[in-house]
């Protein structure tokens, strides 16, 4: 069972947290206007995942505090 929580959607970029019992290190999924990738608690793509596009990076930087809070909330 997986639950999705949209953290932000801006300029075609979505950042979601998907929670399940076997989901690994805390992160959020980043989609739209670039590759499907993930962002970890350090603000960077998770190891082995694609780099952010310029548009994705702008949205992540602008919304970093709420993204980080969303990741922490769902991975307590």
Region roles according to the model:
Residues 1-76:
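Catalytic toxin/effector domains delivered as secreted proteins or via bacterial secretion systems
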